[in-house]
Structures are given as structure tokens and as C-alpha cells.
């Protein structure tokens, strides 16, 4: 099962469908299922499909009205943080609201916020950027960076 992936990465869904002929890979769309691909197995019965990780979702195999178990994928937003002197440069992909935390007395405390790509002038210290999760994306926290 794919499990977890960074936004924009390609993941490989693999499985075994020997004897099913032409099965369908389906993707959840709200409460419905849509065909993502018609699968043809190799001679050993295995298949492989590459799909972009653009939002958390579920996949399943279907054949002649029967569906297999669901496999979930949690997509984590990319959070890139750079320190440039007293400026914290942040890029969250896809563009999502983010919180800038500063390490104070051994605790992370919020000091700023932004959405997508933004910069903040901040005092010296250790900072990180956190993105809250929702139904489409898992939560993410950047590595700490230091400003001088």
C-alpha cells in the first residue's frame, strides 16, 4: 500500500490481478468511485500504475461489479523553509495556510502566519513552519531553521 507521499511526488500502485482479465483501478471521488485506469496484467499477473500524489484519497480494484479493499493515501504538503539573515522564506506547496513558530523556553510558540509563498522579517532564534491537516492533506512541520 502507498500509505504516505509528499505533494507532487509520483507513487507506484502495484498489485496482482491474475485471472481477472481487464480490471479497473478506481479512485474515490467524494462518496463515489471513478475509473482511474484500465489495468492489464503482465504474464505473472502483476500490474503497476504510476499516479501523482495531489491530494489524500483512496484507491481500489474493481472487476465486473465487484470491488476489492480500499487502500488509502495521505498526501503531505511540501514545506520548504530558508533562513536569509533576519528573513524567513517559506514555500508551502500546494498553497495552504501555514503558521510560523519560534522556539521559546523549550516550547514552540506561534509568531506569524502566511499562505503559500511568503517572507517574514523576524528576530534571532529557531523557527519552524507548521501546516494543519484536513481531509485533503496531512499535517506537516518543517525542520527547524535559525535566524541570526
PLM regions with names:
Residues 1-148:
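Low-complexity, Ser/Thr/Pro-rich intrinsically disordered linker/stalk segments at domain junctions
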Amino acid at each position: 500500500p502507498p500509505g504516505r507521499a509528499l505533494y507532487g511526488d509520483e507513487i507506484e500502485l502495484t498489485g496482482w490481478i491474475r485471472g481477472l482479465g481487464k480490471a479497473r483501478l478506481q479512485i474515490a471521488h467524494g462518496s463515489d468511485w471513478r475509473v482511474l485506469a484500465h489495468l492489464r496484467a503482465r504474464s505473472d499477473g502483476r500490474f503497476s500504475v504510476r499516479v501523482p500524489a495531489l491530494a489524500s484519497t483512496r484507491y481500489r480494484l474493481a472487476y465486473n461489479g465487484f470491488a476489492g479493499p480500499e487502500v488509502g493515501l495521505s498526501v503531505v504538503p511540501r514545506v520548504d523553509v530558508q533562513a536569509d539573515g533576519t528573513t524567513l522564506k517559506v514555500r508551502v506547496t500546494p498553497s495552504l495556510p501555514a503558521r510560523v513558530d519560534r522556539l521559546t523556553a523549550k516550547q514552540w510558540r506561534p509568531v506569524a502566519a502566511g499562505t503559500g509563498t511568503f517572507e517574514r522579517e523576524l528576530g534571532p532564534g529557531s523557527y519552524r513552519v507548521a501546516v494543519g491537516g484536513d481531509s485533503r492533506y496531512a499535517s506537516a512541520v518543517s525542520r527547524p531553521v535559525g535566524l541570526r
